[in-house]
């Protein structure tokens, strides 16, 4: 997988949004999940090779000593199974994490990725979906954490993305295009 998140407003000039929209409609949720999990697994392996483990814990609200036994892909499938979040919400949650990484000096590792995924899905779900009827405690149960923790993680993600929840259409379709290219 060759993908670096390098979106900027000039990047999208080559994107044919109508074609991408049609492709997005045909894109399966499992393809998105596979892409996201592959991306994070590659990033974690790269960070593990390049960084000192002690740096991973510095100022990391998402760090957990206990790593879930599920793979990232199975963890995402679990979230989908119990929330039925839409494909667009899943992509938006991924973009939120990419924005955090993009700001620099944030090291993704096995000890923080699961909490990042869970809390970004919660925020994207609240922002993007009309059927927002799940309580934070429900999301916490899905991820195996208590209400206080999920509330703290929600606040932490919002702070790290400066409460910028809106993802412009060009950025969204830029990422969709990357997923589609990877599937071919």
Regions found by a protein language model. Give the residues of each.
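Acidic, Ser/Thr/Pro-rich regulatory low-complexity segments at or just upstream of the first helical elements
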Residues: 1-88, 92, 96-108, 151, ...
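Alpha-helical bundle/repeat cores within regulatory domains of eukaryotic proteins
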Residues: 113-119, 123-124, 128-150, 154, ...
